[in-house]
Amino acid sequence: MKLKPHHVALTVKNTEESIRWYQDKLGFQVIHRYNKHGMEITQLKLENVRLELFCYGQNTKPLPDYRKNLVDDLHVIGTKHLCIEVDNLDEKIKKLKGKEVEFIMHIDTAGFGGRYIFFKDCNGILIEIYQA
């Protein structure tokens, strides 16, 4: 049996703002939109990466403070961040800075090889870009 990731699900505070952010900053495209159980659900795709955005409108709870800091959040059980692999980290950073993305750290090297850097989306969700 073959296993492969299908999507990463993210709860967002505003569907339209989040769609625009992921389209403008990272190049994702909307592939499905629907409502179910009182929430808006949107699927986005960029090459082989799919995101599923959930929004409960005014009933959406804010991101807890401990989830806003990369180091603090690593101490808590659960999913940590979205990581997208790129061919050229320096080029991607330059493009994202040109789109007013603010990075929360300097480039670092992974213990298993490669380089990475983190930033946050418009909801404060941590995103890593990584080059092997």
Q: What residue spans do the PLM features occupy?
A:
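Short hydrophobic/aromatic beta-strand micro-patches
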Residues: 9-11, 83-85
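Vicinal oxygen chelate
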Residues: 1-4, 29-83, 93-120, 132
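Helix N-cap motif at beta-to-alpha junctions
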Residues: 14-16, 87-90
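Tryptophan-centered motif/residue detector
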Residues: 21, 87-89, 112
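Conserved beta-strand-loop-alpha-helix junction that forms the acyl-donor binding cleft
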Residues: 12-15, 36
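Short glycine-/small-residue motifs
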Residues: 129
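Conserved active-site tyrosine of GNAT-family acetyltransferases
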Residues: 18-23, 96, 124
